[in-house]
Swiss-Prot record:
One of its GO terms (molecular function) is cholesterol binding. It is linked to Defects in TSPO2 functioning alter the cation composition of canine erythrocytes so that they are high in potassium and low in sodium (HK phenotype). Although HK erythrocytes have a tendency to hemolyze they do not cause serious disease, but the phenotype may lead to misdiagnosis of hyperkalemia in HK canines and blood transfusions using HK blood may induce hyperkalemia. This phenotype has been identified in the Shiba breed. Its main location: endoplasmic reticulum. It is found in: Endoplasmic reticulum membrane; Cell membrane. The gene is TSPO2. It comes from the Eukaryota. This is Translocator protein 2. The chain crosses the membrane at residues 3-23, 45-65, 80-100, 104-124, 130-150. Belongs to the TspO/BZRP family. It comes from Canis lupus familiaris. The keyword Transmembrane applies. It is a multi-pass membrane protein. GO terms for biological process: 5-aminolevulinic acid import across plasma membrane; enucleate erythrocyte differentiation; import across plasma membrane; intracellular cholesterol transport; lipid droplet organization. Gene3D superfamilies: TspO/MBR protein. The C-terminal region mediates cholesterol-binding.
């Protein structure tokens, strides 16, 4: 890997590092809430998942950059421009989810992000098939995190929906 590869691999981590530094105390307290869905992974697993995803997508972007000749010419505008947009949306999700605790807004941005990642993979596929395939775990991880965001958003709207009703009663 060329030295530029290290930059591409490190770049996706800048947003999460900055968000973490600015919101560390709120993130730790948030993760201790008892109403997380049962499938929500422990904090360390969630953190390791995101670190891995960011490394992989950084490497994938490097492959695309390298296969299009390096530099920052016109052929890179769409493939890396779209990647930059989805990276920015990904960082915004962190702010909405962890700092603002706006789970509905985070969920909407995750759905937008899902579409952006699929679009990025489709554009990258003719350039570098491995780069496109490397985005698939990101889509899987987004599915998990979006389901957590949905669960938390739903619970914030209807906090008692998960409590059992007495025998014979139905919810409205």
């Amino acid at each position: 890997m060329q030295p530029q590869g290290a930059i591409f691999v490190a770049l996706p981590h800048l947003g999460p590092i900055l968000v973490s530094l600015l919101t560390r105390h709120r993130m730790i307290r948030w993760y201790d809430i008892p109403k997380k869905p049962p499938w929500c992974p422990p904090h360390k697993v969630l953190l390791a998942g995101w670190i891995t995803i960011y490394f992989v997508m950084g490497y994938a972007s490097y492959l695309v950059w390298k296969d299009l000749g390096g530099g920052f010419g016109r052929p890179l505008a769409l493939p890396l421009g779209l990647y930059a947009v989805q990276l920015a949306v990904s960082w915004a999700v962190l702010i909405f989810f962890f700092a603002a605790h706006a789970h509905g807004l985070a969920l909407l941005h995750m759905l937008l992000l899902y579409g952006l990642v699929v679009s990025t993979a489709l554009i990258w596929h003719p350039i570098n098939k491995l780069a496109a395939v490397l985005l698939l775990p990101y889509l899987a991880w987004l599915t998990v995190t979006a389901s957590i965001a949905y669960h938390l958003w739903r619970d914030s709207l209807c906090p008692n929906h998960h409590q059992p009703l007495p025998m014979g009663e139905k919810r409205d």
